Amino acid sequence: MPYGIEDIITELSELIRETLVDGQRKRSPSYWKEDPGHLEAMHRHLVRYDRGELVDKDSGAHPLAHVGTRALMQAWLESHGR
């Protein structure tokens, strides 16, 4: 069976979901539209990954999943003039 875009989106969205659940547990649901710190958070998670961390201590998600989620949030903000 061919592996399509929807399959990829489904699998990757689970990684994103793990990071979002953690974020909403700590912050308001719309925090990501107000948070000016996406780039700083991306950097922080990249540094942790570079130091060998493969599981975020708070969320249990992979640090690069946090980087990806924050990158998408920042891209959305910039794409919507915020």
Where do the model's predicted regions map?
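Intrinsically disordered, low-complexity regulatory regions
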Residues: M1-R82
